[in-house]
Amino acid sequence: MVSESHHEALAAPPVTTVATVLPHNATEPASPGEGKEDAFSKLKEKFMNELHKIPLPPWALIAIAIVAVLLVLTCCFCICKKCLFKKKNKKKGKEKGGKNAINMKDVKDLGKTMKDQALKDDDAETGLTDGEEKEEPKEEEKLGKLQYSLDYDFQNNQLLVGIIQAAELPALDMGGTSDPYVKVFLLPDKKKKFETKVHRKTLNPVFNEQFTFKVPYSELGGKTLVMAVYDFDRFSKHDIIGEFKVPMNTVDFGHVTEEWRDLQSAEKEEQEKLGDICFSLRYVPTAGKLTVVILEAKNLKKMDVGGLSDPYVKIHLMQNGKRLKKKKTTIKKNTLNPYYNESFSFEVPFEQIQKVQVVVTVLDYDKIGKNDAIGKVFVGYNSTGAELRHWSDMLANPRRPIAQWHTLQVEEEVDAMLAVKK
C-alpha cells in the first residue's frame, strides 16, 4: 500500500510553486485620473488611425474641422438669440399699454413746459415779474411823426396836400436806418394814389412835395385822407412804418392847415382781391414762336365811381429787366368781367425761352388821367407757384396751347419780384 502511494507520487509531475511578487502598491486601486488618461489616449489613438484612413490632405481636414466648429457656434448663437427675443417680446407685451401712456404724458408735460417757458420769455421781454399784473397796458411803440399841410382851392375844386417832412422814424434796415417814402390817398375809393420820392438811409427825411386831388367841395366831407409812411425795399414787399387818417369833415378849409401828427400802427387790411385773368400759352420750338392768347378776366376790382372799370390788358416780353416787345388788347367798357380772346405772337429762339418772362398787366382805361393798373402777373423765368406750373406745362407740351387762370397781384409786389436776378 505504501509502495502504491509512493509509486503514484513518483509518477505525478512535479508541482512548481511560484511566488508572485506584487509591487508595493499593488493592493491599492488604480486612481480615477489614470483611468481617464488611458481612455483618452485610446480614443485619440483610434481617432488618429481613422483619420489616417481618410484620403484627404491634412489642410483640408483642418479646414473642415474649423467650418464644423463655426457652424456649431452659429447654431448656438441663433438659439440663444431666439430665446432672448421671445423673452423681450413677452416683456414688451406686458408693458406696452403703460409705456405708451407714459410717452404721451411726457409729450404733454414737454408741451406744457415749453408753453411756460414761452410765457416766461414774454415776461422777461416785457419786464414783468411774478408780482406784476399782466393786464397793464403796454407802452405804445414810437413810430415817429409826420408834418403835413392841407388847403382847398375853391376856384378849381382841388384839395392840396403837402407832405413836408418826417422825424424820429424807427430803423427798419440792418444798418440802423430806413428808406422812407409817403403814400397819400383818399378813402373810400382809393383810386387816386400819390407817392413821394424815396429818401435813402435816413430817419428824418425832408420831402417838401405837394399833391392835388380834384374833388368837388360838396363831396369832400364824405372822404378821409390817409397818409402812410413806408420803408422801401428793393427785393421784397415794402414795410409800412405807420400812418394816420384825417376825416375831411373835421378840417377847417377857411385857412391853410399845417401840423405834426404822430404815426400810428397801420390797421391790418385783408388782402385786397384784384380779380383773375385767364390766358393760354403756346410755344413752337422749331419756329421759335411764342403765342399768348388773352381769353378773359373776372371779378376785377372796381376802379370807376360807378362801380365798374374799363379794363384792357398789356403784355410785355421781358429779359434781364428789359422790355423786348409790348402788345395790348382792346378796351372793354363798363365791365368787371371782360372777354377778349385776342392772340399775340412773339419771336423767342429756343435757346432764349428759359430766360424770358411774359408780364400780363390788367389796367383801367381813363380818358382824362393816367391809366391805373388793377393787377399784374408774370410767367417764365423766376416765376413761382401756379405761374411756374403754367410755363412748365407749356414747355412740356410743345405746339399745344395751355390755358390757365391766374390771380392778379399788386403791381408793386410783382415789380419787386421782376427786379430780383437769380
From Swiss-Prot:
Belongs to the synaptotagmin family. Ca(2+) 4 binds at D304, D310, D364, D366. The first C2 domain mediates Ca(2+)-dependent phospholipid binding. The second C2 domain mediates interaction with SV2A and probably with STN2. One of its GO terms (molecular function) is metal ion binding. Residues 142-261, 273-406 form the C2 domain. This is Synaptotagmin-1. The chain crosses the membrane at residues 58-80.
